């Protein structure tokens, strides 16, 4: 939260880190790619409720897991979802600050919580694909 307060207080232009990576400050009132970003209070609280509800369900799923990979992957998803939900509660929007752009294409800004969710989902998919099926 200190980092977000710092970035928000700067009112800065994007900070160039590399030729393809900047630090920016974007307030996302929706979800991925700004979907459901109407900015209305009802949407904010519905998204927050949904994130917590899904997280609770995933915690129950974690408790049933025996594989470390699945536990870590689900933990990343839960951590990311809760992190973004806390942003919504505290700030009214999710603070996104990583900007990646390559060959004229710019990916929508994202944050550490988004990265955790993405890595967690990738690990879950890989685990499902690489685990031998038992008969």
Describe the residue ranges of each PLM region:
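Alpha-helical transmembrane bundles and membrane-interface segments of multipass inner-membrane proteins
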Residues: 1-135
């Amino acid at each position: 939260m200190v980092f977000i307060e710092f970035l928000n207080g700067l009112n800065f232009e994007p900070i160039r880190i590399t030729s393809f990576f900047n630090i920016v400050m974007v307030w996302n009132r929706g979800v991925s790619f700004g979907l459901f970003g109407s900015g209305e209070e009802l949407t904010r609280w519905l998204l927050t409720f949904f994130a917590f509800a899904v997280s609770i369900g995933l915690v129950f799923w974690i408790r049933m897991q025996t594989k470390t990979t699945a536990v870590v992957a689900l933990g990343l998803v839960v951590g990311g979802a809760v992190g973004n939900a806390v942003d919504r509660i505290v700030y009214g929007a999710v603070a996104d600050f990583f900007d990646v752009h390559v060959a004229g294409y710019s990916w929508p800004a994202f944050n550490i919580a988004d990265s955790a969710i993405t890595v967690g989902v990738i690990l879950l998919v890989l685990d499902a694909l690489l685990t031998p099926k038992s008969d």
